[in-house]
């Protein structure tokens, strides 16, 4: 069934909030009326270029190394059809619905700017897929992030043509039947249209946007869980003093320190050891959270800035312009997704570091020499009970896995198309791997949440702060106190899902009002 959420799409005006809406749930998209004038004018330019009887790449020539091959006018439609079917060579699991919706919405936003030469019926066809929640089957693997995301976008286009398979409400069916069920007509491509549909960075950008959304949620949740760990370990709040962080001046550091001050304020546990505590300084994993998590917040913001520009960009090739002497098709390289690859690699660093520091706090909480008087491995009768001993090993394993995954994908390149396309971005993989990294980090932070919550419960007779009590209560709604050894894997999964839900962030949202600079 069509969604009741609506999105009025104005070219070059997409926001991160709108993109999050598209990722999270089906939408009804409409295109601003002003766009159709530019769309029609651009298509008229293509018709004029064809009428000149001169070669124009991608319009009446072959592709890649075959660009010098001239195609006769009566085969221009076949040229575009053959382009799509020959380039539909993806492999692997299909992309999830939210990612595919992002791809289609950003492709509409690009084509609707009137520099790609397609007819309005092509754009309306994509809007029809979006509005009937028809999800093309797009395999996850097969793009190197230049020349555009050719293979995955070809699979998207197959559905528009009534070929291949797609999904409605999670059920796989033929694209032909899905279009008929929705009352939509398959599109027959005209000159330039196939290339316009598949040349672009929308897949890489959608995958990286998914990683960006996950990173935003994780940096927020890791902050509240990290504050819970500080209190559980009887740590100090003095390292969060505003004067320290103002002297350095980094936005993220200042904001995370402010959050820690507010999250811990009023804790009876903190008040219980303000005096007669011979510990001079806490370990870095407690004390340096503003410096580390704040730096993660800053680079998440940098990535968001890049992705917002890219989501509103025209990344087709060639592009259609009108000069004083008439229309021209200019070949360039906007399809090269290097900015997206850099954004993805930046997000990978943030996601890995959030998990890495969280793992260190788990290690601290189970270590009786560091945890402020908590029992070894956070359990009564240690020895008979192993407590959180091996839960920490899981956190360590995932943190180390993320360190390998965080290696920058953008430094890799491999030539393709007989060396015509001799430098590529690897942005598609760079963005895709962020999901697995985020799942790992969510599990690590979930284990820390279990450990910190356990530590809070051992401070009998003392309450943590009001804000942290709310976070602790959310945990205890899902997972009970660990009084003796039990099957722990389901508890870890429950805590992970609580982290991914971002529910722990809802009760202190006003403290994050200035965190994300693109909002």
Swiss-Prot record:
GO molecular function: histidine ammonia-lyase activity
PTM info: Contains an active site 4-methylidene-imidazol-5-one (MIO), which is formed autocatalytically by cyclization and dehydration of residues Ala-Ser-Gly.
Name listed for the protein in its UniProt record: Histidine ammonia-lyase
Statement: the UniProt record of this protein carries the keyword Cytoplasm: yes
Organism: Psychrobacter sp. (strain PRwf-1)
Pfam families named in the record: Lyase_aromatic
Residue numbers carrying 2,3-didehydroalanine (Ser): 147
GO BP term (any one): L-histidine catabolic process to glutamate and formate
């Amino acid at each position: 069934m069509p969604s009741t959420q609506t999105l009025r799409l104005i070219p070059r005006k997409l926001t991160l909030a709108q993109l999050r809406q598209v990722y999270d749930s089906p939408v009804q998209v409409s295109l601003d009326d002003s766009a159709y004038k530019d769309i029609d004018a651009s298509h008229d330019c293509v018709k004029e270029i064809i009428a000149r009887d001169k070669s124009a790449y991608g319009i009446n020539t072959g592709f890649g190394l075959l660009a010098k091959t001239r195609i006769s006018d009566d085969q221009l439609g076949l040229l575009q059809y053959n382009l799509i079917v020959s380039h539909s060579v993806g492999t692997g699991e299909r992309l999830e619905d939210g990612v595919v919706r992002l791809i289609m919405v950003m492709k509409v936003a690009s084509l609707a700017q009137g520099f790609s030469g397609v007819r309005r019926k092509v754009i309306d066809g994509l809007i029809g897929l979006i509005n009937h929640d028809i999800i093309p089957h797009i395999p996850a693997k097969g793009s190197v992030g230049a020349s555009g995301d050719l293979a995955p976008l070809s699979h998207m286009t197959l559905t528009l043509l009534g070929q291949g398979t797609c999904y409605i409400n999670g059920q796989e069916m033929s694209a032909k039947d899905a279009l008929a069920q929705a009352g939509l007509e398959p599109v027959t491509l005209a000159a330039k249209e196939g290339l316009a549909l598949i040349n672009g960075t929308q897949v890489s950008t959608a995958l990286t946007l998914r990683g960006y959304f996950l990173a935003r949620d994780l940096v927020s949740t890791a902050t509240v869980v990290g504050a819970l760990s500080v209190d559980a370990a009887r740590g100090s709040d003095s390292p969060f003093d505003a004067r320290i962080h103002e002297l350095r001046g980094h936005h993220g550091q200042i904001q995370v320190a402010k959050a820690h001050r507010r999250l811990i304020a009023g804790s009876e546990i903190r008040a219980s050891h303000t005096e007669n505590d011979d510990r001079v300084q806490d370990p870095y994993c407690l004390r340096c959270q503003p410096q580390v998590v704040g730096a993660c917040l800053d680079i998440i913001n940098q990535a968001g800035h890049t992705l917002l520009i890219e989501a509103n960009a025209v990344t087709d090739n060639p592009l259609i312009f009108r000069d004083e002497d008439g229309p021209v098709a200019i070949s360039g390289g906007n399809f090269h997704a290097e900015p997206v690859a850099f954004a993805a690699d930046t997000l990978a660093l943030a996601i890995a570091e959030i998990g890495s520091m969280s793992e260190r706090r788990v290690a601290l909480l189970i270590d009786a020499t560091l945890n402020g008087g908590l029992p070894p491995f956070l359990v009564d009768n240690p020895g008979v009970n192993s407590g959180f001993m091996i839960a920490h090993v899981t956190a360590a394993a995932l943190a180390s896995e993320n360190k390998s995954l965080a290696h920058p994908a953008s430094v890799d390149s491999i030539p393709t198309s007989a060396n015509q396309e001799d430098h590529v971005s690897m942005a598609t993989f760079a963005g895709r791997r962020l999901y697995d990294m985020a799942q790992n980090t969510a599990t690590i932070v979930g284990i820390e949440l279990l450990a910190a919550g356990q530590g809070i419960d051992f401070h009998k007779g003392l309450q943590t702060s009001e804000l942290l009590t709310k976070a602790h209560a959310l945990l205890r709604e899902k997972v009970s106190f660990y009084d003796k050894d039990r099957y722990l894997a389901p508890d870890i999964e429950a805590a992970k899902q609580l982290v991914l839900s971002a529910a722990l962030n809802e009760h202190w949202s006003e403290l994050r009002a200035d965190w994300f600079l693109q909002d």
